[in-house]
Amino acid sequence: MLSILKKLFGTANDRTVKKLFSEITKINSFEPAIKILSDAALKNKTVEFKEKLKNGATLDDILYEAFAVVREAASRVCGMRHFDVQLIGGIILHRGMIAEMRTGEGKTLVATLPAYLNALTEKGVHVVTVNDYLALRDSASMGKIYNFLGLSVGCIVAGMTDEAKRIAYNSDITHATNNELGFDYLRDNMKYSMQERVLRPFNFAIIDEVDSILIDEARTPIVISGPVNDNSALYGKIDKIVRLLNVSDFEKDEKLKTINLTEAGITHIESLLIKDGIIKPDTGLYDFENLNLVHYVNQALRAHHMFTIDVDYLVREGKVMIIDEFTGRVMEGRRYSEGLHQALEAKENVKIQNENQTLASITFQNYFRNYPKLAGMTGTSMTEASELKDIYNLDVVAVPTHNKVTRIDLDDEIYGSKQEKYDAILKLIKDCYNRGQPILVGTISIEKSEELSSILNKEKIPHKVLNAKFHEQEAFIIAQAGRFKAVTIATNMAGRGTDIMLGGNPEMLIEQFNKDHNYVAKTAEIKAQIAEEKQKVIETGGLFVIGTERHESRRIDNQLRGRSGRQGDPGKTQFFLSLDDDLMRIFASDRISGVLRTLGLKDGEAIHHPMISRSLEKAQQKVEEYNYEMRKNLLRFDDVMNDQRKIIYEQRTEIIKSKDSYGFLTSATEELAKKIVLTFIPVGSYREDWDIENLTVELHRIFSIKFDHNLVNKNDVTEEDITKLVIQMAHDIYKSKEEAYSSELMHNAVKYILLTTLDQVWKDHLYSLDHLRQGISLRAYAQKDPLSEYKREAFNLFEQMLNNLKELFIQTVYHFHIDLKHLQKEDISLEHKKLQKNMRESREDPAFSKYNAGNSIETYLKPVVSRVDPKDRKPDDPMSWGRVSRNELCPCGSGKKYKYCHGVNE
């Protein structure tokens, strides 16, 4: 019934596209007048558009003419004229939606339309892609169009200086990778002045390969971290013990990707831990004193039994490097968190790096939701349309192809074993190779690609392997995969973003030559050779794409198919499967095995059965739904941290921009003074219950105030009077510092102290949240909702952090002095300039710079409280104690350590 209605009325997508086609005539109506403009007049259109916007016009008012201008500029500069369907894609992107466009339909060119239009507001446009190569390529090729029209173009890649990044981000249009954007956002919020920041306020982002970034990478947060305690030896010891466990000692669930010790396993590992002296005899792994070891054991179990070398990670130059499960690329600089990376290093017997503590983190889900306007392009996203709508409020519109798709998608072939499957794949590859038909073989891991490569080597079939180990060459290899007799093996979607042209890519081949006197002749020769080769490839049937396994996601399978049949080219695709494949084994093996037994399948015989196809599709849908729930759950938890992150980052920016840091100090001083006084002199309490002695100690500890007991001996003194007095005394201390050092220098010092304190407590708070998050799922066993519990406890931790911030900030401000002796006769204003300079230098990008203590503000800020000879301390006068180490006996004579007595609140 539904299919009949769709035929009668069309789908919602059909109706949207039909409506958009009616707008194309408006763009085309400008073409005759724009075509006759000179280059200078065409460029001047940018000035005209900006003037119109300043006079009240909207972007939609100038959309049709602006798109016509970009089309004409592209035609003149690059020799490429936007097709009507590409104009539709541009409108979709401008309106904050996702354009699904098939491979080879020119998504890069489409992005120039909304990028140019939105750049006219002078607020910046980010064109986001998945790797440095694509960012550089697209900024260079499309930048010619923008420059021709008078707009500036920047490109952000790894390893750039802050100054270079600042220039690139201040360009009208900036090409960048999602990773660099995320890290720059975190780094900016660790800087100490607005001038040091590189990013502008968020405006509009166009994400290429949007499904890869917003879906595939959504579960992986980007993290800036710093080292914590060295526990490498313990990881090594636990690794050796876990190797001795039996299969019966643990249970693993491959569907849920979990692993747990059995009762027998707990007993076994406890005996091994006792034998190695790691835990005491007669204690258990889950005893309170040994609970920290559970974390190490669990990560070692995961490393050995849930993670596979050359599938999930590889070892290169003595380092464990993560492989992106979706692209097959090495994720440079990324490390698994929570000790898993250290467990893998112990497993592979390479140097174990220190665990890291999170300094700043954000998921791509929450990073990209910062943009007021967001759009994206991809070849396959309709299968995830509901997720993109639910999480990002992005509608997906499938754009029709310019040429009809002539590719033939053959039915899957299913075999009983992996060997039978490989035999069938080899037979097909031989047939295609002998006829000259190019073949692209897609695998799901490096291990599988190298396994297949080994088979082809034995058969002496020349081929190229494209995987994470050779990602530097991937664009060139994939671009030439359409040549006559080419055989290419690729992991998943490695090389994504680079078109496979039948006969080869002439531009990339031409780039291999130096521009010598034979350059023009060589160029013509290569183009002629490619044209001839293309015709031969078309005669063989075009590119044949072979899938060696079904991926968990239908979308990834569709992306592999989409490598063939670009722009109306001929091509074929087919998947070869076996019951040994991970997806079949985990999700569909029992049902399909039953069908095969019923049908009496013989060795080496393939089967095509509708039930098997349905079972596979159901298995993929099941995994997709599970992964979607995982991402949704991650977002629910990350939203809690994101709300707190926004508050901290906004507050930090406000502090940096502030020209009066004394305002922050005054409000914090008043609030803390009231709190301290009320702690020792509760409202409505009797005078004899007032704890003046400890109030005196606390006021000195926090404010450096020498409080006179006699001030409260008057009968008419109230706690309110004492609070006012404390605030006034604190104010006087600050003013005396201002007189000594100048108000300008004090302003900078207070601002610096506030920012460093904020950074410290925020870092500690993230550490607490990490630990809270790790164990929160256990609350479900107590019939409590883990998310509700996480929200409640995270809020309590946040309040506690803010209280700690105020106290540490106040304590530091009132207990420091600035050492100006080294200045000799230099002016205070010069000291202020030096202080500002050192403040900048002391807090450069923590990901790249080496901290230079000699250039930090700590050179100038020194605590007033100094050590005092113990014999000069009076037990009943804390003022005489000076600085006391926390582990010293308390000078009061109680016999307790200072940290458990008068120092309990420090």
From Swiss-Prot:
CDD domains: DEXDc_SecA, SF2_C_secA. It holds the Pfam family P-loop_SecA. Its cofactor is Zn(2+). PROSITE patterns: SECA (PS01312), SECA_MOTOR_DEAD (PS51196). It is found in: Cell inner membrane; Cytoplasm. It comes from the Bacteria. The keyword Methyltransferase does not apply. GO terms for cellular component: cell envelope Sec protein transport complex; cytosol; plasma membrane. Its main location: membrane. May bind 1 zinc ion per subunit. Zn(2+) binds at C890, C892, C901, H902. It catalyses: ATP + H2O + cellular proteinSide 1 = ADP + phosphate + cellular proteinSide 2. ATP binds at Q86, G104, E105, G106, K107, T108, D499. Disulfide bonds: none annotated. Part of the Sec protein translocase complex. Interacts with the SecYEG preprotein conducting channel. Has a central role in coupling the hydrolysis of ATP to the transfer of proteins into and across the cell membrane, serving both as a receptor for the preprotein-SecB complex and as an ATP-driven molecular motor driving the stepwise translocation of polypeptide chains across the membrane. NCBIfam families: PRK12904.1, secA. This is Protein translocase subunit SecA. It comes from Rickettsia prowazekii (strain Madrid E).
